[in-house]
């Protein structure tokens, strides 16, 4: 089997991080002011990327897909449950990314949002058809173009240097941290789909984490800077006013395609976990078609509740996986369902939703994960291993 290099993995996650969704989420940080907002972005990404790294390392060391690693801690039934949720999450992300990309692109060249949905969806289909291992020069050219164009966008946003919006109290620091955690957290059920194929699992996971973390922070800062220094939350409009024209179209289309490809591709891999009869590539193509149709038919302007829902599902899940694999060093769940871990996950989910009502400076995810990991350790001490599964 052809393995992927650390550089190839880095390119994949560079493309994932450069996205309109990340820039738009960055605009939400403007009420904190630049310095405080930057701190919230950095703190959130350190928390989120630490989990991102451990999730990827489990896949790299075991050679399992993301949902395959879930089966180690939750059993086959637990794997099916999270795989189904992950497919739904990724259909949602595919729709949101195509919607945001089409909306922004239509601002630059107004030929109709639905047309751009079809164009972007069509390009994602091409990316899927070529395949993750054969993208090669296509990915390198796309990433080089994105890197240059992102620098241009950064210069356009920050060249004024004078804030036009004043900080206010509409967003707490803790809520901002949680928004920063949310993006790397949303990739947790995907990263092992790529690190499992790496030549050097540790190096590939580390390079993927660092690349994604740095570039994601950069995108957040561009969005926050746009809101603070231009007073405009629509990044496409900023590019149009700056006269970027074709460059703006390239940024918007390429960034949307390279990110959404990962969503659709991993949805296909997760779908394979649901049944051996499912072909991952065909499933990814179907997800792209569904996402394109949803992007055309439904409004998707505010994704904050969607991000928090992802956090409440997948933060306790990865907390249990990290505890099982790195602390308890369990070889895998026995039986079809690890009831003990399933109960701990439910408690972790409830804890996250409760913590959402409390303003914590480090956000909800870190205390939720700490609490879930502690519960998992206690449960393993109390419940004998033979009675854990069903």
Where are these regions (language model features)?
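Membrane-interface "cap" regions at the ends of multi-pass membrane proteins
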Residues: 1-36, 48, 134, 151, ...
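C-terminal membrane-solvent junction of multi-pass transporters and transport-like membrane proteins
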Residues: 3, 319-390
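Transmembrane alpha-helical segments of multi-pass small-molecule transport proteins
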Residues: 12-16, 82-87, 108-130, 144-154, ...
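Extracellular loop-to-transmembrane helix junctions
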Residues: 27-56, 78, 367, 371
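Juxtamembrane transmembrane-helix boundary signature
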Residues: 42-74, 81-87, 380-387
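Hydrophobic transmembrane alpha-helices that form the core helical bundles
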Residues: 78-111, 257-273
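Hydrophobic alpha-helical segments and their helix-loop junctions in multi-pass secondary transporters
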Residues: 111, 128, 135, 144-170, ...
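Membrane-interface loop-to-helix entry segments
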Residues: 115-157, 167-168, 205-212, 307-319, ...
């Amino acid at each position: 089997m052809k393995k992927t290099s650390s550089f190839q993995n880095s390119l994949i996650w560079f493309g994932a991080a450069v996205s309109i969704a990340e820039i738009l989420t960055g605009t939400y940080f403007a009420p904190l002011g630049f310095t405080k907002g930057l701190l919230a972005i950095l703190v959130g990404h350190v928390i989120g990327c630490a989990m991102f790294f451990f999730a990827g390392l489990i896949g790299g060391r075991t050679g399992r897909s993301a949902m395959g690693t879930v089966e180690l801690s939750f059993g086959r039934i637990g794997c099916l449950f999270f795989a189904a949720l992950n497919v739904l999450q990724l259909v949602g992300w595919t729709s949101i990314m195509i919607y945001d990309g089409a909306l922004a692109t239509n601002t630059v060249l107004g030929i109709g949002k639905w047309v751009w949905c079809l164009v972007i969806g069509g390009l994602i289909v091409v990316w899927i058809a070529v395949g993750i291992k054969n993208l090669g020069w296509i990915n390198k050219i796309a990433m080089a173009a994105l890197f240059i164009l992102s620098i241009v966008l950064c210069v356009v946003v920050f060249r004024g240097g004078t804030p036009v919006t004043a900080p206010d109290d509409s967003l707490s620091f803790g809520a901002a941290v949680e928004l920063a955690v949310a993006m790397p957290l949303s990739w947790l059920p995907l990263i092992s789909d790529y690190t499992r194929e790496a030549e050097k699992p540790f190096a590939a996971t580390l390079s993927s984490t660092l690349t994604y973390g740095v570039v994601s922070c950069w995108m957040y800062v561009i969005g926050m800077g746009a809101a603070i220094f231009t007073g405009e939350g629509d990044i496409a409009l900023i590019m149009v006013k700056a006269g970027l024209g074709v460059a703006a179209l390239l940024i918007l289309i390429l960034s949307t395609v390279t990110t959404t490809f990962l969503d659709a591709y991993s949805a296909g891999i997760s779908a394979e976990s649901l049944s051996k009869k499912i072909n991952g590539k065909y499933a990814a193509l179907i997800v792209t078609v569904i996402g394109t149709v949803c992007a055309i038919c439904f409004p998707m302007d505010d994704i904050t509740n969607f991000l928090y829902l992802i956090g409440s599902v997948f933060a306790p899940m990865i907390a249990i996986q990290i505890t099982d694999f790195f602390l308890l060093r369990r070889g895998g769940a026995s039986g079809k369902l690890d009831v003990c871990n399933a109960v701990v996950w439910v408690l972790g989910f409830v804890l996250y939703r409760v913590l959402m009502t409390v303003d914590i400076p480090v956000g909800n995810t870190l205390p939720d994960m700490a609490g879930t990991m502690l519960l998992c350790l206690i449960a393993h001490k109390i419940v004998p291993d033979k009675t854990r599964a069903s």
